[in-house]
Amino acid sequence: MIYMVELALLETARRAEWDTWYAAHQRRLLSIPGFRASQRFEAIHTAESPFVALHEVDSPDIFTGPYYRANGGPSNTGEWQVKMGRWHRNLFGVDHTPDVPMDARLVVVEDGSSAALSNHVAVRWMEAVGLDRSVPRRGLAVMPPGTADRLVGTPGIRVLKPIGARLRSAS
């Protein structure tokens, strides 16, 4: 399943410090049984929630378990909880997160916005199955920058660059 977290950093002057904290947060999440992979992204254009993290998880049960309650979720973000806004947490019923190379883009497509994409673009559609369910359906596509960057400004489409490589749990 894909656990997708979207947010805005409200204290942008502390971006480097936040990135360091978030990298440690990813490692902590990956230590929770059932978290398999994690990768962070940033929009290359203005967006309401410019930061996105895709986490691959085994099941929705993780979010009610003791390991997640002790190490994950908004209550375990310390001082950063109030410095992050426009926060959305959705769980999608897709088995694996895409592996987005550092030289590629992740394109997030809102339901009904795919008409702007070429028929040659493979969009992986996902249905929301848990947590906030702030959107019922959303698509993901991995594309080369030259192709994806031309979509900037298209309504319902966000173009994101990786902040770091995809991380995997040790188990």
Where are these regions (language model features)?
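Macromolecular interaction modules
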Residues: M1-S171
